[in-house]
Amino acid sequence: MKEIFLLKLGEIVLKGANKRQFEDKLRQNIRRRMKAYGNFDVYLMQSTVYVEPMDDEADIDGAWDACHKIFGLVSLCRCRACEKDIDKIYDTVEEYLGDDLDCAATFKMESKRSDKRFPLTSIEISQEIGGRLAEAHPTCKVDVRKPEYTVFVEVRDLAAYVHGPAEPGAGGLPTGVGGRAMCLLSGGIDSPVAAYMIAKRGVEVECVHFFSYPYTSQLARDKVMELARLVTAYCGRMTVNIVGFTKIQEAIRDNCPEEFFTLIMRRFMMEISQRIALGDGCGALITGENLGQVASQTMQAMQVTGAVVDIPIFMPLIGMDKEEIVTIARKIGTMETSVLPYEDCCTVFTPKHPKTKPTIGQLITAEKNLNREALIQEALETVEKITVKYDDEPFI
């Protein structure tokens, strides 16, 4: 019989009365993702999502790779289905996993029988299949404590399923069950990771990027768009809002004390982001801020920059070490793009001696020569909305 994927649910199984809502959203997300790889049937039974190719044209390998990036799944098994007959099960194990056993020094059997109508117990299935495999592969010894390879047999209601060790899923909750949020996306390492981490909790993520042409180049903008595209491999398509920020930065440079440049810039970014977010149905902002990492990310600095917004600000990286953030960036594939040497607006007009312990009063005084509302409205008129999908052509 053909290959099939068994995708095991994560914390969804712990949900109560609204569990069905989470399951339906997960199934919907998987169906949408599989469309790019051919015709697949997606159905859910016994806390497992079954993904079954419906014709020979389906891209099995591409679909399998994509399943690893779908939030809500804790483990994935690539299986061969067969009839619920002990001889057919053995033949399928031999055909599907025999080469793997020949490459291993030791193995063990693990069986699970959820269909109690099957005449053999789980232990008896393991004994029967394991005994035959030991005879057929004399160089691969049985070791139930620390095996080099494990053969799994699951006898379920529809069929028996044979597979090797499961692979880890993306975890988290299905995209779309946790509302919508707007991520302030720069070209650095942190903000793409922050977007990924909040998306992992079931949140649909949009992004806003502040573009300061001609102080920043088209390459810098393309870099940010590519980071957004890479994140969509996990969270699905997203909208990126590009905001023209040049006039605001020039106004800050010309009218404000230098030590407050970055903080005032951040306050404008937060307020503009909130207005775009509320217009797009987002209930929170997301930033890649990390306590103490730079001068604008002290506790006092974050207090004054966050004071201009009313909606929650999610900061998933706030207590992480930089190396932890880098590890996640490498895992999700954004690191190589983040380190490309194209500066963004955060590096424009950087003060030599930034204020690290500002107060709200100091910021209000520093901004007194700015027409905040006029500058914000002018920036909002420049917003360009771009929809990004993972299967788009790379931007750089």
Region roles according to the model:
Residues 1-182, 192-238, 307, 355-360, ...:
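RNA-binding accessory domains that recognize and position tRNA/RNA substrates
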Residues 128-133, 166-178, 249-332, 378-395:
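Active-site adenylate/phosphate-handling loop in enzymes that bind or generate adenylated species
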Residues 183, 207-209, 242, 287, ...:
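Structural beta-sheet core signal
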Residues 188:
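Conserved G/P- and acidic residue-centered "switch" motifs that form tight phosphate/ATP-binding loops
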Residues 228-255, 342-344:
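A conserved beta-strand->alpha-helix junction
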Residues 333-341:
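A short alpha-helix-loop-beta-strand transition element characteristic
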